[in-house]
């Protein structure tokens, strides 16, 4: 009995120690929105890391550059607490990471879980990137680059901090009602990580302007990821699967696998659920369901790649989507946004960063074609759409074995399906103003005869002809 009591006491002491709270003001944080609190917050995190404690804050606004959450630490932001990102790029240290599909050095995020285990970022508080200064610098650079044939370099040369980075880590949790707003670049980037849960985040990036490249949640060459209860309003892809770009992505060859995305709403974005355009490492065993997209989302489900990306997608399951006034229900493009996707260094430019060379490294044609197959899409309800389908695969590597079931779509136009092999439709209700254009009717089975027209190929619109703001949503 005495031994049992001693053991119970030891367990209670260990539990108490592991649950110890560390309050940031005790380490010098002011929370006045003016004083730079980076060092004080990091000291608090480092102290908590010694025994797996929780970092807490008094209500206030804590101006900060990059902070790094350590293994075993919970960063808890209660209601009334805001971590406000510094507008000085120098407050975000440059470090190795992956950006838009290539490994390179880039400013750290505002909140980082970098090569850690069992770290948590939760609470009903706010992480605010205050990103407009970075958005404006991007647009200035891009408008000078575009006429010089350097659209592809804009996103890499205009360095901007992400809001949260989970990099090469495992056992990470983010959520609990967090408000993530005004990110300078991507909002929540999960890269090279395993066993990550995002549960309960509100993302608002269209405040005070339209933030370019302000993706919602990017799952990048990672495995065993759950995203649920997300409420997203951004100016690029909302819920996005990525796996590397072109030669560098093919070199790394890390897939995104075993991902579940569910019970979320997308209010404004370039697309609701997106695969790509960074497809090089491939996607396997992805499921997304109970997703709602609204009028501010041009595309409900988007697959995008390019002739130099390569990669694959297999066993992808998308179901129980509700699309309300979302213009395009399903878009698949294997030649997405050419001015961004294909890096060509003008011959008159002799001095350029090393990553330009990485971006412009040629990829053999056969290796560059992404191959999507064994995709199941079912229980999609779309009302008020402009176009049902915009599907453009490769003639040499068609989109294979797509099964679409239980579709209930009302759209002004049927759109088109090109370079598809062994597509089957079943139990579909289509109310279309114009039929779906097919090149080869025998490759697509099960569509009502009245909803199909076989004929000449429909040429997709070149997004480079659109405004800068519209290009990224094409």
Task: List each language-model region with its residue ranges.
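Bacterial N-terminal signal peptides
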Residues: 7-14
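Extracellular/periplasmic carbohydrate-active domains that bind, remodel
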Residues: 19-474
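Intrinsically disordered and other compositionally biased segments
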Residues: 6-7, 19
């Amino acid at each position: 009995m005495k031994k049992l009591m001693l053991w119970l006491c030891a367990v209670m002491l260990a539990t108490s120690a592991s649950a110890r709270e560390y309050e940031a003001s005790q380490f010098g944080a002011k929370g006045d929105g003016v004083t730079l609190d980076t060092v004080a917050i990091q000291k608090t995190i480092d102290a908590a890391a010694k025994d797996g404690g929780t970092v807490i804050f008094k209500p206030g606004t804590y101006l900060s550059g990059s902070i790094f959450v350590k293994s075993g630490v919970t960063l808890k932001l209660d209601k009334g607490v805001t971590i406000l990102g510094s507008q000085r790029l120098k407050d975000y240290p440059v470090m190795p990471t992956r950006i838009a599909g290539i490994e390179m050095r880039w400013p750290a995020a505002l909140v980082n879980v970098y090569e850690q285990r069992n770290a948590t970022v939760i609470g009903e508080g706010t992480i605010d990137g205050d990103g407009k200064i970075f958005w404006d610098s991007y647009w200035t650079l891009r408008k000078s680059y575009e006429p010089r044939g350097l659209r592809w370099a804009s996103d890499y040369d205009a360095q901007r901090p992400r809001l949260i980075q989970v990099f090469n880590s495992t056992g990470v949790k983010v959520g609990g009602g967090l408000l993530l707003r005004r990110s300078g670049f991507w909002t929540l980037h999960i890269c090279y990580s395993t066993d990550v849960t995002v549960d309960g985040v509100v993302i608002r990036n269209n405040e005070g302007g339209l933030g370019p490249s302000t993706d919602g949640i990017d799952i990048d060459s990672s495995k065993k990821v759950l995203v649920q209860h997300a409420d997203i309003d951004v100016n690029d892809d909302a819920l996005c699967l990525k796996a590397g770009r072109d030669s560098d992505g093919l070199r790394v060859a890390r897939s995104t696998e075993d991902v579940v995305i569910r019970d979320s709403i997308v209010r404004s974005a370039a697309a609701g659920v997106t695969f790509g355009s960074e497809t090089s490492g491939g996607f396997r065993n992805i499921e997304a369901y109970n997703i709602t997209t609204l009028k501010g989302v041009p595309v409900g489900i988007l697959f995008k790649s390019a002739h130099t990306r390569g990669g694959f997608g297999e066993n992808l399951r998308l179901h129980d989507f509700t699309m309300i006034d979302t213009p395009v229900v399903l878009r698949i493009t294997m030649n997405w946004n050419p001015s961004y996707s294909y890096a060509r260094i003008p011959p008159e430019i002799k001095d350029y960063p090393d990553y330009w060379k990485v971006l412009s490294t040629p990829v053999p044609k056969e290796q560059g074609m992404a191959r999507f197959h064994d995709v199941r899409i079912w229980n999609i309800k779309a009302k008020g759409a402009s176009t049902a389908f915009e599907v453009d695969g490769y003639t040499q590597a068609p989109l294979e074995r797509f099964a679409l079931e239980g579709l209930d779509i009302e759209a002004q136009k049927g759109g088109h399906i090109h370079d598809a092999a062994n597509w089957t439709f079943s139990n579909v209700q289509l109310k279309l103003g114009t039929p779906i254009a097919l090149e080869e009717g025998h490759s697509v089975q099960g569509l009502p005869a009245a909803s199909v027209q076989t004929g000449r190929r429909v040429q997709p619109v070149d997004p480079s002809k659109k405004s800068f703001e519209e290009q990224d949503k094409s």
